[in-house]
UniProtKB/Swiss-Prot annotation:
SUPFAM superfamilies: Ribosomal protein S18. It comes from the Eukaryota. Pfam families: Ribosomal_S18 (PF01084). Belongs to the bacterial ribosomal protein bS18 family. Mitochondrion-specific ribosomal protein mL66 subfamily. InterPro entries: Ribosomal_bS18, Ribosomal_bS18_sf. It is found in: Mitochondrion. GO terms for molecular function: structural constituent of ribosome. Component of the mitochondrial ribosome small subunit (28S) which comprises a 12S rRNA and about 30 distinct proteins. The gene is Mrps18a. GO terms for cellular component: mitochondrial inner membrane; mitochondrial large ribosomal subunit; mitochondrial small ribosomal subunit; mitochondrion. It comes from Mus musculus (Mouse). One of its GO terms (biological process) is mitochondrial translation. This is Large ribosomal subunit protein mL66.
Amino acid sequence: MAALRRLVSGCGRQLQAFLAGPAATGWLWLPARGLREVVKIQEGKTTVIEGRITETPKATPDPPNPSGQCPICRWNLKHKYTYEDVLLLSQFIRPYGGMLPRRVTGLCREEHRKIEECVKMAHRAGLLPNHRPQLPEGCLPKDKPKLNRYLTRWAPKSVKPIYKKGHRWNKVGMAVGSPLLKDNVCYSRRPLKMMH
């Protein structure tokens, strides 16, 4: 039985070497064809349609600001992203939702802190539902706690609401968002409010 197992494993190794070897590239992998442009030529009653090979574009386009010290500065995105830009944020997080370290992402300190804050806000808003650790089999997720409208660490039932926050023109505001994002570009007519 052991001899048969050795024979099968040896044949498997030889087959792998044959498939991965340089001779296999000719029939296993086809060469890249390049981009083709469809050209229509009419000569009298005949119409010839042919595909001419065009130059292939660059794999990665050049950034507008190549002297920037981090990817966000290089692409001029410094004050132009928020917690809602999930595609941008997902490049800097692990599959389970944690932030990648600065040495991996190549971000400067300021942008790393801003991205970290945006990732936290996106998690809280529920915009990154797939980026969380998977539960072991057989475990059921706990029910989400009800929203604590009073923003305190005590149970909402034990808290007395604040009925008077002041007159409308002099109300005590509630902090919303992050002060790190206060310099962001605002495209709406209303200015960005950090206190609601």
